[in-house]
Amino acid sequence: MSAFPPPPEPDAPRVAHVEPAPDAVRGILALADRARADDGVAPFNEQTRLTLGADGGPTLLLAHGTDDDPLGAAVVAHGDAGIEAELVVDPAHRRRGVGRALLDAVLAEAAGSPVSVWAHGDHPAARALADATGLDRARELLQLRASVAEARTGLGERQMPAGVALSSFTADDADDWVALNARAFASHPEQGRMTRGDLDDRVAEAWFDPASLLLARDADGRLAGFHWLKVDGGQAEVYVLGVDPDRAARGLGSALLAAGLDLLAERGHDEVDLYVEADNTPALALYRRAAFRDAAVDVQYRRA
């Protein structure tokens, strides 16, 4: 364990690196679960939870008080474009400088490289902390929610384009899916970088259902689009909806969305969520037409 220089106040939080041992990972995830129960939003995204403790995974920082109980944590991923971090503070220890101590440690970890920090739920305390440390609001990820029935009605009658057939995912489709996902999300900083290993990690999750990953193929067998649904803990989500750029603006996206909503309705789901970038105008237009409404927002703050 390596420690950052302690703050001058004797009772201020101390922040230190910790090895990603199973006990440390379990402790951080338990802390995250407590924060989620209190805030109504998870402090870590799915990729973070999947890579915690993995070889080559993110750096872990823990904040401790005078009695060594963990007060908060930061998960820091290093990449070619700098570092990206997510922070969590135990609800029982907020307003005591823990968040500031963690963020200062993250900024020190960056050593002058660009820094991005996610604030899930756009908590007022996160906004104040970003202002105090000179981080700029750089990106917004919207969480939208809709009644399955209202969303389906909003789309109206939707048929697959001529020559396009739907099927469910099989292991033989994996490489085609990774290739199309990269094309469909070429400009997306996370989704477009998904590898075969990332896909395999998600396929191995308990929530994965191959029948909920709908594939649209042209008559020649080429994968043209997909709609991946996720149902976890009873909550349905439009996990990823992607269309080959060559097939954009031809109705395939709305037809895939409708097909997924029909599947959710058949399975008895009343409500569905999704996440979309705030500046993705075409996708937002589709989802607004389908009666999706704002539910929450995640904000990425950045220092260049």
Swiss-Prot record:
Disulfide bond residue pairs: none
Catalyzed reaction equations: 1D-myo-inositol 2-(L-cysteinylamino)-2-deoxy-alpha-D-glucopyranoside + acetyl-CoA = mycothiol + CoA + H(+)
Gene Ontology molecular function, alphabetical: mycothiol synthase activity; protein-N-terminal-alanine acetyltransferase activity
Signal sequence extent: none
Chain segments annotated as coiled-coil in the UniProt record: none
The N-acetyltransferase domain, residue ranges: 16-155, 164-304
Keyword Acyltransferase listed: yes
InterPro entries in the record: Acyl_CoA_acyltransferase, GNAT_dom, MshD_Acetyltransferase, Mycothiol_AcTrfase
Binding site for acetyl-CoA 2: L241, G242, V243, A248, A249, R250, G251, L252, G253, S254
Residues holding 1D-myo-inositol 2-(L-cysteinylamino)-2-deoxy-alpha-D-glucopyranoside: E46, E190, K230, E237, Y275
Record text on subunit structure and interactions: Monomer.
NCBIfam families reported for this sequence: mycothiol_MshD
PANTHER family attached to this UniProt entry: L-AMINO ACID N-ACETYLTRANSFERASE, MYCOTHIOL ACETYLTRANSFERASE
Name recorded for this polypeptide: Mycothiol acetyltransferase
Organism: Clavibacter sepedonicus (Clavibacter michiganensis subsp. sepedonicus)
Gene giving rise to this polypeptide: mshD
